Amino acid sequence: MEKKQKGTFTLRRLFPALHEEELVRIQDSSSVIRLRKGQNLFISGDSPRSIYGVANGCLKIVRESTEGESVITRVVRPGNIVGIREVFGEFKYSRTSVALKDSEVFSIDAQAVMDMISRSPAV
């Protein structure tokens, strides 16, 4: 998993009600994660530290069945986000995220999002 600063994902798509100043704050606390096909973004049981927006590529969210098989519960495409429920619920991931193909994911620091919401509750 390779990280690089900034990215092509548009924060405006995630937070359309934000003023430019708030978008810059969020962008400053964000990075792009590049995943190869088959790589995990997060694993069931991990503690959430970020909210993720898919910029390019595609992820699947899977859970293990009682028989030990992986069951796809969601496919996350460009422009969609993942991890909000875990961040705001303050609990660990109950599923695993796997790149279906090479992907770029915008990682937004969870604390920065919480701070933004306290400043701009309309979001």
For the regions a protein language model found, what residue spans apply to each?
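Cyclic-nucleotide recognition modules
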Residues: 74-123
